[in-house]
Swiss-Prot record:
Transmembrane segments: 12-34
UniProt keyword terms in alphabetical order: Membrane, Transmembrane, Transmembrane helix
Originating gene: smim12-a
UniProt name for this protein: Small integral membrane protein 12-A
Organism, scientific name: Xenopus laevis (African clawed frog)
Xref: PANTHER family: SMALL INTEGRAL MEMBRANE PROTEIN 12
C-alpha cells in the first residue's frame, strides 16, 4: 500500500504542493498582520515636493537673481574644439 501512495504522491506532487504552499502562505500572511497590527505612519505636515520648494525658496531669498554670469564668462572655461586647435587666436 505504501509504494502505491508514494508513487501517487510523486506523480501528483505539483498538484498537491502548490495548493498546500498557497494555504500555508496565506495563513502565515494573515497571522503576521494579526500579530503586528496595522502600521502607524507618522503624519507629515508637508510633502517632499513642498519641502523641496520651500528649501529652494529660502536659498533664493538672500540672492540677487538679476546678477547672473554672462555666457562669455561661461564659455571661457569650456575646452576648445578639436578643429580650432590649429587656428590662430584673434586679437
Amino acid at each position: 500500500m505504501w509504494p502505491v501512495l508514494w508513487a501517487a504522491a510523486r506523480t501528483y506532487a505539483p498538484y498537491i504542493t502548490f495548493p498546500v504552499a498557497f494555504v500555508v502562505g496565506a495563513v502565515g500572511y494573515q497571522l503576521e498582520w494579526f500579530i503586528r497590527g496595522t502600521p502607524e505612519h507618522p503624519v507629515e505636515e508637508q510633502s517632499i515636493q513642498e519641502k523641496r520648494e520651500e528649501r529652494t525658496l529660502q536659498e533664493t531669498m538672500g540672492k540677487d537673481v538679476t546678477q547672473v554670469i554672462s555666457l562669455k564668462e561661461k564659455l571661457e572655461f569650456t575646452p576648445k574644439a578639436v578643429l580650432n586647435r590649429n587656428r590662430q587666436e584673434k586679437s
